[in-house]
Amino acid sequence: MAIFDDIKEVVVEQLNVNPEEVKEESKFVEDLGADSLDVVELVMALEEKFNIEIPDEEAEKIATVGDVVRYIETNK
């Protein structure tokens, strides 16, 4: 679960939410209150944290914290 913990840290910092709110099933927009700009900034922060590039077409498919976990596990 180390990847989840790292992602959670970035999400808490970028979206200014309580750590308890960030669960694998949490949706960035509906549950965590992100807008489209927040999502773009979050993707950029995740790319930097994990030293990966998330193409726009893939970023558009990422709606939940779990989606990010699976993407990073698959593409790291």
Swiss-Prot record:
4'-phosphopantetheine is transferred from CoA to a specific serine of apo-ACP by AcpS. This modification is essential for activity because fatty acids are bound in thioester linkage to the sulfhydryl of the prosthetic group. GO terms for molecular function: acyl binding; acyl carrier activity. Pfam families: PP-binding (PF00550). GO terms for biological process: lipid A biosynthetic process. Its main location: cytoplasm. Gene3D superfamilies: ACP-like. The keyword Phosphoprotein applies. Keywords: Cytoplasm, Fatty acid biosynthesis, Fatty acid metabolism, Lipid biosynthesis, Lipid metabolism, Phosphopantetheine, Phosphoprotein. One of its GO terms (cellular component) is membrane. The modification O-(pantetheine 4'-phosphoryl)serine is found at S36. NCBIfam families: acyl_carrier (TIGR00517), PRK00982.1-2 (NF002148), PRK00982.1-3 (NF002149), PRK00982.1-4 (NF002150), PRK00982.1-5 (NF002151). PANTHER family: ACYL CARRIER PROTEIN (PTHR20863), CARRIER DOMAIN-CONTAINING PROTEIN (PTHR20863:SF76). Belongs to the acyl carrier protein (ACP) family. Carrier of the growing fatty acid chain in fatty acid biosynthesis. This is Acyl carrier protein.
